[in-house]
Amino acid sequence: MKMTDIQIAKENLKGHSICLCKDGAYFTDDGRGISPMLRFIGEGRDLVGCSAADIIVGKAAAMLFVKAGIREVYGEVTSQAGYD
């Protein structure tokens, strides 16, 4: 059975702070906090439609995911503000 993008992102999160996946291709980062997302957005990466797995999803991270067009998010820890 083929893994979904969110399953691939979750599987490859181990040892990293964030993993983004789209159409089976994934990339990871080990930066702290929201710095990986800020860097990805600043680099002009096309994140629309990606699935994301992150260690901690708070309000700021959730807002960046929405701004970037992330399709779905898995957080090992998610704050109520991040969920809302």
Where do the protein language model's features map onto the residues?
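Conserved mixed alpha/beta catalytic, RNA-binding, or beta-rich assembly cores of soluble enzyme
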Residues: K2-E76, A81-D84
